[in-house]
Amino acid sequence: MDKIVIHGGNRLKGEVRISGAKNSALPLLFATLLAPGQHQLENVPALRDISTAGKLLSILGAEVHSQEGVFSVDATRIRSVEAPYDLVRTMRASVLVLGPLLARLGHARVSLPGGCAIGARPINLHLKGLEAMGAEIDLDHGYVEARAKRLHGANIYLDIPTVGGTENLLMAACLAQGTTVIENAACEPEIVDLATALTCMGARIEGAGTDRIVVEGVDELQPLHYAVMPDRIEAGTFMVAAAMTRGDVRLLGARQADLEALISKLQEAGVTISAEDHALRVRGPRRIAPVDIKTQPHPGFPTDMQAQFMALMSIADGTSVVTESVFENRFMHVCELQRLGADIAIEGKTAKVRGVKELLGAPVMATDLRASASLVLAGLAAENTTEVSRIYHLDRGYERLEEKFRNLGAHIERIKG
């Protein structure tokens, strides 16, 4: 099994190109199921989850080709409506084929999802919304089976602003008959990116990026030609890395508007951040000030940056409080950070982080995608050598991470196992 070995203590300096956003690329790939013809997506990151999505599209009958960040998908001949367990169990985003298959073909059979083990994250809100649009849904031996002659518009209220649920219902509504209104919709930038792409295909959508999205269904959509937005979580991870190493890093392609909550908290911690031409420049402080955060749906502080920010606070000059309000069971990285010398105490959904003067390298084990990133960041700032195992989690969400850090001056390498 591969591991990453880090000899910490180097200041990060230079430029890094931010990859396309995984959390945008996945729904965009599955949106190709909505229309026959040749689709093309650019700026697609080379990640394990993206590869899984390509395999799933191929199983369904699409012709998929990829080369250097460009995906070509011909979704003309969809032969199957089943997303099998063997694929879906490795990536919960696979459930996003449910809405497109049901809307275009009137039938979908999708295994219940897997992915990171950070809480239940049920898909009941997806199913409740599709039922409101006229779908008949059965749960059978771990599969969701959905049927509808044609979906119809509906007024849907989401009990929580689920990103995946909003995406699934948004895609399904594009081919539904009549008007669909999604209330308490997720507002994440990836929702806006999906809606923009669907509009390019001929969909009629208003309100994406707000908590009320209105979709006027159309009879058919056209093939998609689109470039995936930059990954705000990757950008945020490099911002924290620069802060932890007292670095000076330019993030090429990073968009300030997608990162306002994180930028605000980093500046509160003493980090200097400036917008430049299609880039953000991040300069770490000599002293990191303690900052309290509470994760919230967008535009609040992103839960996908909680673990990385906790790593930063572990070397702050004082005590901070981290509250996780989006997912349960998302403090699994704490035990591993403690192995590096972090002083963290958990009480329910809150972690009290007492900053220490320095972290010391040690063998640690990744437990999920963002936890693995936090351990790499801690290793970059720690004295001596840190080994991070189970990095297959990391490969689900970061493209060539160790190479990018190495180009910024980090002493980091991947050891094949």
From Swiss-Prot:
Listed EC numbers = 2.5.1.7
Q: What class of enzyme is it?
A: transferase
Q: Where in the cell is it found?
A: Cytoplasm
In what pathway does it function? Cell wall biogenesis; peptidoglycan biosynthesis
Has keyword Transferase? yes
Does Transferase count among this protein's keywords? yes
Record's protein name: UDP-N-acetylglucosamine 1-carboxyvinyltransferase
**Which source organism?**
Syntrophotalea carbinolica (strain DSM 2380 / NBRC 103641 / GraBd1) (Pelobacter carbinolicus)
